[in-house]
A protein has these predicted regions:
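N-terminal, polar/charged subdomain of small-to-medium soluble alpha/beta proteins
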Residues: 2-134
Length: 134
């Protein structure tokens, strides 16, 4: 399923009213990778996250406790990383998706994790996953 298909399914699920919380370019140093040269060293990993909420209504009050606090995204990343080393970006991203889907307000999310330093030059490699709550 490509990103366009995912967004189409998302809109079918919620109608035409959707809020997206975003975290872009959140970079952490962490140990990850299966290759011998990746063992015992940290790499810069960039996270880009979209968290989808049903509805697009103005909060009843203009106060932080009326909305899902964006910091839960960064906290989820920190928690997943603190659980221990991952060999695969796919495992890391899947674990993060599951953590981000916990709040009742969340109906779906998209997570990308990108290794910034694995290749020389401008090349990057990464993994993206999209998931809707059932």
């Amino acid at each position: 399923m490509n990103s366009l298909d995912f967004h189409r399914l998302l809109m079918e699920k919620v109608g035409f009213s959707l809020t997206t919380l975003q975290l872009r370019g959140f970079i952490v140093d962490m140990e990850i990778g299966v290759l011998e040269e990746e063992q015992g060293v940290t790499q810069r990993i960039r996270f880009d996250v979209d968290v989808f909420l049903n509805g697009a209504d103005k909060p009843i009050e203009d106060e932080i406790d009326m909305v899902l606090d964006y910091d839960f995204i960064r906290s989820a990343i920190s928690r997943i990383i603190s659980n221990g080393r991952s060999n695969l970006l796919e495992s890391l991203v899947a674990d993060l998706l599951d953590a981000l889907l916990i709040p009742v307000e969340v109906i779906g999310c998209s997570v990308s994790a990108t290794k910034l330093d694995i290749y020389d030059g401008e090349s990057e490699i990464g993994c993206s996953m999209l998931k809707l709550k059932e």
